[in-house]
């Protein structure tokens, strides 16, 4: 989130932001971005647009745009997807279990386009949360940011807001008494 916020401060956008383009080096905890041809760079005279964007990370409003026209909203959405997956067992925020009344199976990108986000305060008519989801154990403040990121008509959190929330989560991380290798975020307990 810090890297994304820093780039946004200078008017640059990642656009093709996805886990495969991010690496963390264990020894130094340095974060590196790869495959940077998906960036949109603001030059002194002109913008050098992105050339690529990846499905499952494209914001709903961006489906009608070319990646050359995408900007900060694309990065805000993709960053929220990555953070959701990191905090929720690798589950994509638009994946879930289709309800019995669902007419057909939709791809993740189709679910994004139709705002089928099952993990929010209001649930979803198309799908229920994935059975291995642990979203209910996340703090309310984190869930509110996810709702803002994925519910239609909301103002998506900035990278700086995510940075502050992740700092909050790290500072409030609790260790499980039953398993020293396990940690959790809220007073709801760890589930073990």
PLM segments and residue spans:
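Catalytic-loop of the protein kinase fold
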Residues: 4, 8-26
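Conserved end of the kinase activation segment
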Residues: 62-73
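Conserved C-lobe activation region of Hanks-type protein kinase-like domains
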Residues: 74, 83-143
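Terminal C-lobe "cap" of eukaryotic-type protein kinase domains
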Residues: 148-174
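Regulatory extensions appended to serine/threonine kinase catalytic cores
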Residues: 164-167, 171-192
């Amino acid at each position: 989130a810090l890297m994304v916020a820093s780039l946004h401060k200078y008017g640059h956008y990642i656009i093709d932001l996805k886990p495969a383009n991010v690496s963390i080096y264990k020894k130094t905890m340095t974060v590196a971005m790869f495959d940077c041809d998906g960036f949109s760079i603001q030059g002194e005279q002109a913008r050098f647009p992105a050339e690529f964007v990846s499905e499952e990370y494209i914001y709903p409003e961006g489906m009608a745009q070319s990646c050359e026209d995408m900007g900060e909203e694309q990065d805000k959405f993709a960053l929220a997807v990555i953070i959701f997956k990191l905090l929720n067992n690798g589950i994509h925020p638009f994946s879930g279990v289709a309800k019995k009344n669902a007419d057909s199976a939709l791809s993740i990108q189709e679910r994004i386009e139709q705002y089928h986000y099952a993990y929010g305060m209001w649930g979803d008519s198309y799908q229920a949360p994935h059975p291995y989801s642990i979203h209910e154990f996340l703090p309310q403040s984190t869930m509110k940011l996810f709702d803002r990121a994925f519910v239609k008509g909301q103002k998506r959190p900035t990278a700086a807001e995510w940075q502050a929330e992740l700092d909050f989560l790290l500072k409030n991380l609790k260790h499980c008494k039953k398993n020293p290798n396990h940690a959790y975020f809220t007073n709801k307990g760890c589930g073990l």
